[in-house]
Amino acid sequence: MTKQPEDWLDDVPGDDIEDEDDEIIWVSKSEIKRDAEELKRLGAELVDLGRNALDKIPLDADLRDAIELAQRIKMEGRRRQLQLIGKMLRQRDVDPIRQALDKLKNRHNQQVVLFHKLEHLRDRLIVEGDDAVAEILNLWPNADRQQLRSLIRNAKKEKEGNKPPKSARQIFQYLRELAENEG
């Protein structure tokens, strides 16, 4: 029996193991399951959305039909439909869907932040008066100085008389209108 040389595997044609472009990425079974579960949760979030919100998310016809069907069915059938939606999402690029869903979620947070800023501005208007009015006019040049001063004067009177803050609410509504008309 003849002994093979030690480098006999180096001469095998088509041996591209050292080629870095064809690198195989090993993914564990657990990671695949986690990704599938995450996509199923994304599908469940899509099913929980209303029709108007779904219109704002880029979905193809098959996926949209599956989501609408899942919204109509109940219990065990719904669970199976959610699994189907998860499977459909695995075959698609979900980044645009996630981005659109994040925009929908963040819109509420942005409104809350805006309302807090407007409440703070309203409180400053009532406390500081004309200095804060000048700042409002810098922010929104189309604001009506006379209307703001009148509302501030009424809000101060209501506060001193321990009356309901009707004018303070009107100031907030006016500031909200200014902010909405700007954007």
Swiss-Prot record:
UniProt main location, coarse: cytoplasm
UniProt keyword Disulfide bond, yes or no: no
UniProt record, GO biological process: assembly of large subunit precursor of preribosome
Superkingdom field: Bacteria
Span of the signal peptide: none
CDD domains (UniProt xref): YjgA-like
Cytoplasm among keywords: yes
Stated family: Belongs to the DarP family.
Role this protein plays: Member of a network of 50S ribosomal subunit biogenesis factors which assembles along the 30S-50S interface, preventing incorrect 23S rRNA structures from forming. Promotes peptidyl transferase center (PTC) maturation.
Name of the protein in question: Dual-action ribosomal maturation protein DarP
Organism annotation: Salmonella arizonae (strain ATCC BAA-731 / CDC346-86 / RSK2980)
Taxonomic lineage of the native organism: Bacteria, Pseudomonadati, Pseudomonadota, Gammaproteobacteria, Enterobacterales
